[in-house]
Amino acid sequence: MISPENVVPMVIESSARGERAFDIYSLLLKERIIFLGSQINDQVANLVIAQLLFLDREDPDKDISLYIHSPGGVISAGLAMYDTMQLIRPKVSTICVGVAASMATVLLCAGAKGKRYALPNATIHMHQAMGGAQGQASDIEIAAREIMRQQDILRNILVKHTGQPMEKIIHDSDRDYYLNAQQAVEYGLIDEILQKPENK
């Protein structure tokens, strides 16, 4: 039996040369839209990075839209995506649909200034870096030092992109910290709430 999460919608596109079937993500990529809709891990990061690099090569002057609906995930994978977003020439607009949590919040706020958005009912969430370790005491100590190093990196990124002082970032991310879209604007995580334009 086919699992619903493994079903990818197909879209038929007609042209003078005939019909062609695209999976929905390929069609979005043609429009310079990337969708991050899962937990962040190495495989997901590799796919997003490949798409960013492809769109950079295709047209370095045209914006890219990164839609985010993610609970976060592996810090190293998220930082690989973050560094690529900062490296490529096109401006990356970020849009939170649903939820951006943890590492996904870092990616959301790292979009191009003035082009970071959330939908009206989106939830943005920050917290401390998390990790686990087992084994000898010295191994656990090494793992703890590494998670603290990564946490410092994430906090510095949040300071850079939100304009908030480090003390506030440390205080607010010490435990689970939830924001609605308006609070995220006030915090500096996003620039604007996307609304449907009113009909005139």
From Swiss-Prot:
InterPro entries: ClpP, ClpP/crotonase-like_dom_sf, ClpP/TepA, ClpP_Ser_AS
Signal peptide: none
Pfam families: CLP_protease
EC number, as in UniProt: 3.4.21.92
Subcellular location: Cytoplasm
Keyword Protease on entry: yes
Location (main, coarse): cytoplasm
Keywords per UniProt: Cytoplasm, Hydrolase, Protease, Serine protease
UniProt-recorded Gene Ontology molecular function terms: ATP-dependent peptidase activity; ATPase binding; serine-type endopeptidase activity
Subunit-level organization: Fourteen ClpP subunits assemble into 2 heptameric rings which stack back to back to give a disk-like structure with a central cavity, resembling the structure of eukaryotic proteasomes.
Record's catalysed reaction(s): Hydrolysis of proteins to small peptides in the presence of ATP and magnesium. alpha-casein is the usual test substrate. In the absence of ATP, only oligopeptides shorter than five residues are hydrolyzed (such as succinyl-Leu-Tyr-|-NHMec, and Leu-Tyr-Leu-|-Tyr-Trp, in which cleavage of the -Tyr-|-Leu- and -Tyr-|-Trp bonds also occurs)
GO CC terms: cytoplasm; endopeptidase Clp complex
PROSITE patterns: CLP_PROTEASE_SER
General function of this protein: Cleaves peptides in various proteins in a process that requires ATP hydrolysis. Has a chymotrypsin-like activity. Plays a major role in the degradation of misfolded proteins.
Active-site residues (renumbered): 102 (nucleophile), 127
Protein family: Belongs to the peptidase S14 family.
Protein's name according to its UniProt entry: ATP-dependent Clp protease proteolytic subunit
Biological process terms in GO annotation: protein quality control for misfolded or incompletely synthesized proteins
